[in-house]
Amino acid sequence: MNKNMSIVGVPMDLGADRRGVDMGPSAIRYAGVVARLEKMGFNIEDRGDIFVTLPHHFTETENHKYLDEVVEANEKLANVVSDIMTAGRFPLVLGGDHSIALGTIAGVAKHVKNLGVICLDAHGDLNTGATSPSGNIHGMPLAASLGYGHERLTNIGGYTPKVKAENVVIIGARDLDQGERELIKRIGMKVFTMHEIDKLGMARVMDEAIAHVSKNTDGVHLSLDLDGLDPHDAPGVGTPVIGGISYREGHVSLEMLADADILCSAEFVEVNPILDRENMTARVAVALMSSVFGDKLL
């Protein structure tokens, strides 16, 4: 694991319907992420937050809400993440809603030719403007990173696609729209739903996921949406879905990722302090970060 790490926050809530997730980066910092990682021996550089332009009024372009502002912020993020990679540091991005994965993945994939992606998420984030029931771009970043959807999203960073379907794994899915299910089947993407986790156990699921995502890749990006966890353990998220990954399953999955030593970047998204209880979800995010970055009890 690269011990030189750069943190960047993205106070973005325009990709989602519920306000408040723009305060996620501040909540995670307040929960002590820098101190925790420094105690683990990381050299931390906090680059502050990406500036997100706020719209003067509601806009929607071909079933994409706030398209201009989301694209602008993600282009900035892609450049910052690319600069971090150029400096030989590990980018840790704090959200913000999950639309910021557009910029994170665009910045990382410029430097990692065959990028793998592991998503811990209740949702697929595989919608396009043609399939999205809501028009919220936080439900589209994985599709766009694969090259599906509006060209302004697919071309963030100046190129498309960023990743191949065979190099992506979703873990913890339990709420997929019809268009997402059809796309998953059409492109043959590896998805471990909560059914597989319940049936096989998280350890076996992670063994299979790690083997799959590291087979033909040069590095792996972790995209962790806190709604992947059960709302009992992570209540402060905008789109909670009951029956999710437990707190301990989350730690096991990330401890196994740490042992595999395949990560080149990570993002933690969808922490919404307005919906949280005593910053519980931000504290869970920091605890999970400590596991994925190698913290051990013994």
From Swiss-Prot:
CDD domains xrefs: Arginase
Enzyme Commission no: 3.5.3.1
Catalyzed chemical reaction(s): L-arginine + H2O = urea + L-ornithine
PROSITE patterns xrefs: ARGINASE_1, ARGINASE_2
Associated pathway: Nitrogen metabolism; urea cycle; L-ornithine and urea from L-arginine: step 1/1
Cofactor(s) in the UniProt record: Mn(2+)
InterPro entries in the cross-refs: Arginase (IPR014033), Ureohydrolase (IPR006035), Ureohydrolase_dom_sf (IPR023696), Ureohydrolase_Mn_BS (IPR020855)
Cleaved signal peptide residues: none
Record has Transmembrane as a keyword: no
Protein name: Arginase
Organism: Brevibacillus brevis
